[in-house]
């Protein structure tokens, strides 16, 4: 814990729809790295892509969350942050059952979208969503 530093970076739904999920993930990583209070000697990233950042020692590790404890920990931090965000959305956006499905495209969630439509928190470029008539935005 003493030698650990972390931050969470985010990308908006509009950014994801505009630049795609991969580029938005890289943008969120970049934001998280830039928010760190101290520049780390190296940064390990789960996957095969790294954000475009000069003057940082970045290394992508495929399946890194299964191989490296610090990457596993980062995955948990990211999941907890996302779940907290989704829980907040669920309280403000009744009807989508986000408190149960956490924003994943479950049958229940898709049924709710068919009934009440999508809102500004839905990614319009996500395949199941893009098939629905867009309203309630």
Predicted region positions:
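RNase H-like, Mg2+-dependent phosphodiesterase core
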Residues: 1-137
């Amino acid at each position: 814990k003493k030698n650990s530093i972390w931050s969470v970076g985010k990308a908006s739904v509009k950014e994801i729809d505009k630049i795609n999920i991969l580029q938005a993930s890289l943008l969120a990583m970049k934001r998280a790295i830039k928010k760190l209070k101290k520049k780390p000697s190296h940064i390990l990233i789960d996957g095969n892509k790294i954000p475009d950042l000069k003057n940082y020692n970045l290394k992508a590790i495929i399946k890194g969350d299964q191989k490296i404890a610090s990457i596993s920990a980062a995955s948990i931090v990211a999941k907890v942050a996302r779940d907290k965000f989704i829980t907040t959305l669920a309280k403000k956006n009744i009807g989508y059952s986000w408190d149960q499905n956490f924003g994943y495209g479950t049958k229940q969630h898709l049924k709710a979208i068919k009934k009440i439509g999508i809102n500004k928190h839905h990614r319009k470029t996500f395949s199941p969503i893009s098939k629905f008539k867009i309203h309630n935005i």
